[in-house]
Amino acid sequence: MVPQTHGLLLLYFLLQLQGPLGAVVFITQEEAHGVLHRQRRANSLLEELWSSSLERECNEERCSFEEAREIFKSPERTKQFWTIYSDGDQCASNPCQNGGTCQDHLKSYVCFCPLDFEGRNCEKNKNEQLICANENGDCDQYCRDHVGTKRTCSCHEDYVLQPDEVSCKPKVEYPCGRIPVVEKRNFSRPQGRIVGGYVCPKGECPWQAVLKFNEALLCGAVLLDTRWIVTAAHCFDKFGKLVNITVVLGEHDFSEKEGTEQVRLVEQVIMPNKYTRGRTDHDIALVRLHRPVTFTDYVVPLCLPERAFSENTLASIRFSRVSGWGQLLDRGATALELMVIEVPRLMTQDCLEHAKHSANTPRITENMFCAGYMDGTKDACKGDSGGPHATHYHGTWYLTGVVSWGEGCAAIGHIGVYTRVSQYIDWLVKYMDSKLRVGISRVSLL
C-alpha cells in the first residue's frame, strides 16, 4: 500500500543522509518540509510524483466531491459518479423489467420503459391494462374490448378517428356536442343568476329546444338531428292531437326576437307503449319536426352516445348540466332567458333510500336516476321538463338524461329525477330511422 511505500522511502532517504559518526545528521527546515509536508490531495511522497487519478483518489482511499470534480472536469459526469460512489449503484440489481433502461439516482432509480410497458419497474403491460373499464381505455369517445388483443377506439358518426387511434376530430362543420360560439372565442362567459343557476350565455346551450302550445311555454326538449328532438312523454299528457304545438330552436330570450330562432311544427310524437299517462316510468318521447332545421352557431345537436359508453363512462361523471326556462323559484315566475345549472348525480342506492323515506314519492325504477342538491339550492323546475341532462367528456357533450319529475322546485330534502337515456338509446336510434304515421304513436320497447 502507499503508506508502506512512504515509510520505506523515508527510511532510505534518511540513511542516505548519514555519514561518518561526526557528520551532521540534521537537515534544514525547508528540506524536511519537502519530505514530511502533506499536500492538499497527496497521501504520500510517492503520490506527489503521480498525476491525479480515480484509482488513487477515490478507489484506494476516500475522496471528497471536490476531488472527484477535479478528476472528471464535467458537472454531469461528476454528479453521475458521485451518486454511485456515495450511495451505491441502485441499478446494480437490474430492477427494470421487460427491457427497461435503469438510471441511478440518490437512494433511488428511474426505469425508462419500452413502449408497451409502464410501472415503477416496467412490470405492467399496457395492453393488459388498456381495457375499457379502465379510464375508458384512454379513448376520446367509444371503446370496445377484444379477447386476446387490446381494446379499440371509435367515434360518433360526426367525428373521425385520428392516426393515434384514440382521438376523435370533427368531420362536419357542426358536429354534435360541440359549442361553436365558445370554440370561436376560446372561453365561456357565465352571467346573471332554473333555481340557483345562471343565464346560459347566448349560443352556449345550442341543443336546447322549447315546446310551445299557443305560443306559451310547454316543455323543454333537446335536438338530436335535423328533424328529431327528445323530450318527456308527460309533456303530451293533455293532448290527443298535435295542434298548435310548435318547437323553437336557437331561442334564448323570450322577451325579444334575436334572429337566431328557427320555428318548426310537430309532425309526429313517438313514446314507449309502457308509458302510462300521469305516471313517471318510461317518461321519454321522440318528436319529429315537419321539416329539418339548419345547423348554425346557435343550433347544434347534442350527441346521443352509445349505450355502453353512457353506462360505463358518462354515468360515473358526477356533475352534468341541466338547462331550461322553468320557474326561477317554487311557484314563481318562469325565466325569460335560458338558464343552466350544474347538478351532481347521486348514487342509485342513495336515490332509492331517499325515495323510500319520502311520502308520496313515485317509485324509482331502473329507467331513472337522481341528481341535485339535498339542501334545495339548485334544481330543475316546472317548465324545464323534457330538457336535457348533458354530460361533458373529453371536449364533447352527450345526452344522458331528460328532466322528468321532482317534488317541488329545489325543495329542501328533495331531488330531481331524470329519465335514464341509456335505457332507450337503441329504441331512439331504431325509430329515428322509421316512418310511422303522423300524430302520436305508442310503440314497443326493444
From Swiss-Prot:
* Localization, UniProt: Secreted
Into which EC class is this enzyme placed? hydrolase
Q: Which domain of life is it from?
A: Eukaryota
Q: Which organism is it from?
A: Rattus norvegicus (Rat)
Signal peptide range: 1-24
UniProt-annotated catalytic positions:
234 (charge relay system), 283 (charge relay system), 385 (charge relay system)
Gene assigned in the entry: F7
The GO cellular component terms are: extracellular space; serine-type peptidase complex; vesicle
- Write down which residues bear the modification named (3R)-3-hydroxyaspartate: 104
The family database entries (InterPro entries) matched by this protein are listed as: Coagulation_fac-like_Gla_dom, EGF-like_Ca-bd_dom, EGF-like_dom, EGF-type_Asp/Asn_hydroxyl_site, EGF_Ca-bd_CS, GLA-like_dom_SF, GLA_domain, Pept_S1A_FX
Query: What is the name of this protein?
Result: Coagulation factor VII
Query: Which PANTHER family does this one have?
Result: COAGULATION FACTOR, COAGULATION FACTOR VII
Where is the PTM 4-carboxyglutamate found along the chain? 47-48, 55, 57, 60-61, 66-67, 70, 76
